[in-house]
Amino acid sequence: MGDNQDMGKSFLETVKFDDRGLVPAIVQDQETGKVLMMAWMNLESLQMTLDKKRACYWSRSRNKLWLKGESSGNMQVVHDILIDCDGDTLLLKVSQTGGACHVGYHSCFYRKATEALSMEICDTLMFNPEDVYGKKS
Amino acid sequence: MGDNQDMGKSFLETVKFDDRGLVPAIVQDQETGKVLMMAWMNLESLQMTLDKKRACYWSRSRNKLWLKGESSGNMQVVHDILIDCDGDTLLLKVSQTGGACHVGYHSCFYRKATEALSMEICDTLMFNPEDVYGKKS
């Protein structure tokens, strides 16, 4: 068991990036425990997050560093970064400004499966994305 | 915004599996909000989870279905399954028997980064894995 804890290694040595050089980061509200989103980090974005204490991810769709909130203002102040037993998933405890989700909800997990396997909204709309990101053309 | 919510689709139609046919599932304690682990599901394990209301994953290391707790007894009763805005991450709200982590902790996220970028234990040991899984040869 002691071996599995890897406590002799540094935090950055313990992180296992996948074959794309990415690691998933679960993002949780520090105070309420609500899970807000999951995003991906490469080493550069993780180092920037550790340095600035603001969540920074790797955008797989835009293929670039993504300082959370740089467009929307909805920043995440990072209090703690935890790592799982296998070293291949991170958990960020944050204070979220506004909503985390680009659709306008507080959490990206704003829909849940019903018994009949349709979906229902289970979260609060925080902003109108057209006001924040502009209208889609 | 309405388009992004995809509320006209069924839950299963909304899930986007990756190129390996897998989707990550974050697992959170239903009562306390503690994040316990992240695992991966394929369609079969997701359908089994929906059917049995017990968490079932796809083990990438063993390449087979993995009914959580089948070896350890540490089952997860599933209360709700949420899906994120992009449809590519799930969030399970569960009641966890014993510890979720094979190392013996309540959560797989039992280590956190310190200011000096070493790690410290931040969780409770629930069982001795040698008692549960046997000694490693």
Curated annotation (Swiss-Prot), chains A, B:
It holds the Pfam family PRA-CH. GO terms for molecular function: magnesium ion binding; phosphoribosyl-AMP cyclohydrolase activity; zinc ion binding. The keyword Hydrolase applies. One of its GO terms (cellular component) is cytoplasm. It catalyses: 1-(5-phospho-beta-D-ribosyl)-5'-AMP + H2O = 1-(5-phospho-beta-D-ribosyl)-5-[(5-phospho-beta-D-ribosylamino)methylideneamino]imidazole-4-carboxamide. Mg(2+) binds at D84, D86, D88. Its cofactor is Mg(2+); Zn(2+). Zn(2+) binds at C85, C101, C108. Its main location: cytoplasm. It is found in: Cytoplasm. Keywords: Amino-acid biosynthesis, Cytoplasm, Histidine biosynthesis, Hydrolase, Magnesium, Metal-binding, Zinc. The keyword Zinc applies. Disulfide bonds: none annotated. It comes from the Bacteria. GO terms for biological process: L-histidine biosynthetic process. Pathway: Amino-acid biosynthesis; L-histidine biosynthesis; L-histidine from 5-phospho-alpha-D-ribose 1-diphosphate: step 3/9. Binds 1 Mg(2+) ion per subunit. Binds 1 zinc ion per subunit. Its EC number is 3.5.4.19. PANTHER family: HISTIDINE BIOSYNTHESIS BIFUNCTIONAL PROTEIN, HISTIDINE BIOSYNTHESIS BIFUNCTIONAL PROTEIN HIS7. Homodimer. Catalyzes the hydrolysis of the adenine ring of phosphoribosyl-AMP. Belongs to the PRA-CH family. This is Phosphoribosyl-AMP cyclohydrolase. The gene is hisI.
